[in-house]
């Protein structure tokens, strides 16, 4: 595959860069198509991404419809058929600025002003379209073989919510039609697994713009799953000596100034509220409250490690374009804990956290994950607490502990929390890009900021080390992950309805009611479908919509024999004694058997 660089030379594209170049060229072709259809369009940035490409564009008051996106894609195909040569050229600063001003590319002009040290700028031209770009690109538009516009969303200029909201148009591009077809098949699977779709079908949660974007509400079925997850992780934590607390969802601005969140995390926080001369803010995380709980009384080295846990409600001002059901919202519940320990206890505490993470993943059959040591970017003084010695000590300590524990990890710069490095455990869901579920963060910063101490063996006051950790992460996100992994077919212990009783006719309704009552007494979540519908309809509803683990199909034969006909998710049917069936289900519930 031939590509052209900004200096004009043509060469074979390195194989590992082919998709990037294809997608970057697709972004330019899409921008050209947009400009043809909307001459007043003003373009911002249009890069290739891991999975495709996008262009952020200012369309004034124009709101694009699905039909408009289809027309843009149609125009892109015209441009590829025109087989326009893609040619680079370079201009000195003054001429480059003049060119962009003449073409009314205001965002490009502003971007050039930001690049104050640059004396010249490179451009690529195809037909009438010119874009400021460093390349490389395909040599002709016809070389772009397979692409598709996928969606539009909003994006702030320079990712700053104080700036104008632009229209972001996304697309994908591949080497050939076969790859595009395979991608579309994957997308169909993604749509079928989407937790928002399944959540609506199963009545797990809902959203409403009147309540607010990014503020999902759990319905009875969904809250049942949520509570089971809460019970599961609390049991695990109690067995390890955790002490559970409950703290308020708000705090004073001064609390977050003390912690450093106000300086380093304010853009992700909701605006402050003024009450009786005091400023309050919804909390984005729980560390400051837990620091204050530790500070509530004096501590000795004998008290440590002290493990404080909470299922805590948090609020973050996520941009509207990033919101996604319960996977990412503006309100969520964090499986949070803070472990206060001595420096000598760091290794054993990190080891215990890691063991709990991996034990939990085994319980939920999570196998596709990777560990990342997230470090600060030393050049970013705004994002991170400015103490080089503290950072070097913390990063080296966590790196050494992970190495000693034999945990394979990669390192990523710029992904640390503002107060310390962290171990992130990223999962690869059934569909979509990986994201972080679990985390363990090492912190020498906040204990000092809150003047936390303990009396050591020698009688002197020392500052404890804090481990911030989340095993399930956000319960909301963890639930979204499980929904998409299982397609809503939760294991018996998690299922909102564990058994559905289906009388074949009204004649067996009384027997069905008796069986239902017996299951309820055994602690099983059961629902009786007494609608006057054909049994086939009831089975489909229970299996495809409610996705229950077990159905009891009760006809005259079962009523006469006093047993039950059991149908599982696979469609296999067996006849069992009632007590035998109850023993089977209660065993799965008690042992939290992962049988989806």
Regions found by a protein language model. Name each.
Residues 1-42, 50, 56-596:
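NTP/phosphate- and nucleic-acid-binding module
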């Amino acid at each position: 595959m031939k590509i052209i660089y900004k200096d004009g030379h043509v060469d074979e594209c390195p194989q590992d860069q082919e998709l990037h170049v294809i997608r970057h060229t697709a972004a330019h072709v899409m921008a050209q198509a947009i400009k043809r259809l909307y001459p007043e369009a003003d373009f911002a940035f249009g890069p290739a991404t891991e999975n495709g490409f996008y262009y952020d564009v200012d369309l004034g008051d124009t709101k694009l419809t699905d039909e408009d996106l289809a027309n843009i894609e149609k125009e892109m195909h015209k441009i590829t058929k025109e087989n326009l040569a893609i040619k680079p050229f370079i201009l000195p600063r003054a001429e480059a600025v003049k060119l962009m001003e003449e073409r009314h590319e205001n965002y490009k002009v502003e971007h050039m002003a930001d690049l104050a040290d640059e004396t010249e700028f490179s451009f690529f031209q195809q037909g009438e379209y010119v874009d400021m770009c460093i390349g490389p690109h395909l040599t002709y538009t016809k070389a772009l073989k397979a692409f598709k516009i996928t969606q539009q969303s909003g994006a702030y200029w320079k990712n700053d919510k104080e700036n104008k909201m632009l229209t972001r148009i996304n697309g994908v591009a591949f080497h050939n039609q076969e790859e595009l077809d395979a991608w579309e098949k994957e997308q169909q699977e993604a749509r079928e697994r989407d937790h928002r779709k399944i959540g609506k079908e199963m009545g797990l949660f809902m959203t409403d713009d009147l309540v607010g974007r990014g503020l999902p509400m759990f319905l009875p079925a969904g809250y049942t799953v949520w509570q089971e997850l809460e019970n599961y992780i609390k049991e695990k934590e109690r067995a390890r000596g955790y002490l559970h607390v409950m703290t308020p969802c708000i705090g004073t601005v001064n609390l977050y100034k003390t912690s450093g969140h106000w300086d380093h995390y304010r853009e992700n926080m909701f605006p402050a509220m003024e009450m009786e001369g005091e400023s309050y803010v919804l909390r984005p995380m729980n560390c400051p409250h837990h620091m204050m709980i530790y500070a509530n009384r004096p501590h000795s080295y004998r008290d440590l490690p002290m493990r404080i846990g909470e299922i805590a409600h948090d609020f973050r001002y996520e941009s509207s374009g990033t919101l996604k059901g319960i996977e990412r919202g503006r309100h969520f519940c964090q499986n949070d804990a803070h472990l206060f320990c001595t420096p000598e206890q760091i290794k054993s505490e990190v080891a215990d956290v890691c063991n709990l993470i991996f034990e939990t993943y085994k319980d939920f059959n999570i196998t596709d994950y990777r560990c990342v040591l997230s470090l600060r970017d030393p050049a970013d003084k705004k994002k991170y607490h400015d103490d080089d010695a503290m950072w070097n000590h913390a990063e080296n300590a966590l790196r050494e502990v992970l190495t000693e524990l034999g945990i394979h990890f990669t390192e990523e710069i710029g992904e640390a929390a503002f107060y310390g490095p962290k171990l992130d455990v990223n999962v690869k869901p059934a569909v979509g890009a990986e994201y972080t579920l679990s985390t363990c963060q090492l912190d020498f910063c906040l204990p000092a900021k809150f003047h936390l101490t303990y009396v050591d063996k020698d009688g002197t006051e020392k500052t404890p080390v804090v481990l911030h950790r989340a095993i399930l992460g956000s319960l909301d996100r963890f639930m979204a992950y499980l929904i998409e992994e299982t397609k809503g077919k939760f294991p018996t212990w998690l299922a909102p309805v564990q058994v559905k009783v289906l009388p074949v006719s009204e004649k067996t309704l009384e027997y069905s009611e008796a069986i239902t009552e017996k299951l309820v007494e055994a602690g099983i979540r059961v629902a009786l479908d007494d609608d006057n519908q054909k049994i086939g309809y009831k089975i489909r509803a229970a299996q495809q919509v409610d996705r229950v683990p077990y159905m009891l199909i009760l006809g005259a034969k079962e009523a006469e024999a006093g047993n039950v006909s059991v149908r599982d998710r696979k469609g296999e049917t067996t006849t069992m004694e009632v007590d035998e069936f109850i023993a089977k289900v209660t065993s799965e519930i008690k042992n939290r058997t992962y049988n989806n």
